């Protein structure tokens, strides 16, 4: 496994600066973030900018395992839905343009909806992801579902249902376990259940159970990374363990992405040592 950091923590910072920050702290991978208000907008980024980003990645030695690019395909307004779908597909096209030696990164996106809508909306959600998976198959890109507390796909069984319902190798899982943790789930159960679908992960810390929960910087809560990392490795995962900093943290008045990135690095590398897990460098 490799230790990564998500540009979600600093998505409006120039992309070269994102890469420089993550590389300078010792991480081995970076997740880029593409959206309408981010420094990297998949719908407007030029070929020159893409080449510059790829060059910066190559110079740094950082792996690019993922691009986060969210779009709500449950929107009822046809124009809004069309824009959301176009943004995610543009993210998939960007993944192809930024592909490195190991191929294009996956594209992470959420299912949206509300928990109480799962039964009524699950087929539409599956159809939405099947649509994206077909586009991914054409482009050679994997779409990775991000489960999310407060959304329809908030529990391991629901996540497994939609993954199996779509049944495409181009539709896999971005394993963000924090959302399961604040739902009161036990990683000794959900890791064996879902790891076989995982192509990428997010890691953060958390406190409390939904609805009274808070996402935190790794190390601020009580989550046992030294116990978790060997479990997910034993389950067969060998990709990036990518730190994601929640908007809850970013909204703090003293928020500093470089400081939380450095602190997260120390927390995860220490936990890996205590758990007997080695983060391998990029080949």
Model-derived segments and spans:
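A generic structural signal for short
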Residues: 6-7, 41-42, 79-80, 120-121, ...
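Structural motif corresponding to the early beta-alpha repeats
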Residues: 28, 32-127, 142, 233, ...
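Histidine-acidic metal/acid-base catalytic patches
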Residues: 1-4, 11-28, 51, 58-60, ...
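Conserved beta-alpha-beta core of the PfkB/ribokinase-like small-molecule kinase fold
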Residues: 145-146, 173
